[in-house]
């Protein structure tokens, strides 16, 4: 699917540009790159940010930082309202040169929204002051550690299977079903997962499930509904979640959920 054009990045007086976008569930922005850094802020809904070697879940009220010239794609998991800001190479030097999923606090949220809303209205000096403060807040924001490894893009068959699992990580879809869809044997796919990702299919899918569940909990969704969507009973899901992350789903939601703020 064609990607939307970024805003005009040629005005040197404005080293940060902002734009608001919305996408339906299932939408995909194909892989691309640009010379400016980018922050994608999920106001509501969830997206997956895919780079050449990993996928990062971006739940509501979270943002992802992309350094300049990093090839990336976006897959929308649920109806998405987002705010994007583009940072010039000069401003981007104040931030890390790797992708980061950030917890968006009240001040950073207001800065991102203001930078988008006032993109064409504020005078350059005022806008630059907002941009400098936003960079400081981005550097101070708390980070998320949830990441899912992806195979090399040259392995198109395995990458397509991984993307299918990310779209529906339920236990109901096993390696046998994936092998049948791919026209390969279970043994062949097992070897591909181990060789390309350093782990077996079950372990990799569990990482996807944890990322998906964590995003849903941050969004305030009920534990039973999340468990059912992933193919678990509520008790089995809670046991798996606690075993992997050290806290129960309810405890995780209480710590991380942020009420929706448009």
Regions found by a protein language model. Name each.
Residues 69-99:
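Ligand-binding loop in jelly-roll beta-barrel domains
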Residues 193-200, 240-252:
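A secondary-structure capping/hinge motif
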Residues 172, 176, 184, 195-235, ...:
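Terminal helix-turn-helix DNA-binding modules in bacterial transcription factors
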Residues 53-68:
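Short acidic-glycine-tyrosine-enriched beta hairpin
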Residues 29, 44-50, 63-64, 72:
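Short beta-strand segments in beta-sandwich/barrel cores
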Residues 119-182, 195-207:
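Short, Lys/Arg-enriched, Trp-marked, Pro/Gly-tolerant hinge/linker segments that flank
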Residues 1-46:
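Generic protein-terminus/edge-of-domain signal
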